[in-house]
């Protein structure tokens, strides 16, 4: 079953609705973004979520100690890193990590295997931006790619293309933000429809 992460959640009610609709993880942004929240807001979201829903904090080149403090304060389960963080940074953080890799070329994806993290998130490459750009990339870059850890697919996913994406890439999970928004705000019907579509394709692909 392909996992689903709803990223950029700013409201506890949206987080709970997404979790109850079947989201496996909720992403909370601490980096510079229109979706950024304060640690206090993030803590409220984390505390509202039901059991078995992963709480993922998104950071970009944040000092390690600051990430650790925020993670402990909010009750984060996983740290997702979108900057130039090194392998040592990931190893020494003390939390399960997801490392975001921009899909520049095949070489950078293959080199990402060296990161000591729990999963790799492959996102569109847009110069000057660290994810959340709403753009897709050429999924052919992932064809035959040998990764030694789970692959999470991101980059411009929405209800119209996620079925094709899952069927073609066969990722461990998918990550969506702008694809379930209306006028920059998370939309519960879109979230439900997105998760439903992923589950349908997952079932057809695996038969379970």
From Swiss-Prot:
Isomerase listed as a keyword: yes
Catalyzed reactions: N-(5-phospho-beta-D-ribosyl)anthranilate = 1-(2-carboxyphenylamino)-1-deoxy-D-ribulose 5-phosphate
Enzyme class, first EC level, given as a word: isomerase
Coiled coil (UniProt feature): none
GO MF terms held by the record: phosphoribosylanthranilate isomerase activity
Top-level division of the source organism's lineage: Bacteria
Pathway: Amino-acid biosynthesis; L-tryptophan biosynthesis; L-tryptophan from chorismate: step 3/5
EC number: 5.3.1.24
Pfam families to which the protein is assigned, alphabetical: PRAI (PF00697)
InterPro entries per UniProt: Aldolase_TIM, PRAI_dom, RibuloseP-bd_barrel, TrpF_fam
A GO biological process held by the record: L-tryptophan biosynthetic process
Keywords: Amino-acid biosynthesis, Aromatic amino acid biosynthesis, Isomerase, Tryptophan biosynthesis
UniProt family annotation: Belongs to the TrpF family.
Protein name per Swiss-Prot or TrEMBL: N-(5'-phosphoribosyl)anthranilate isomerase
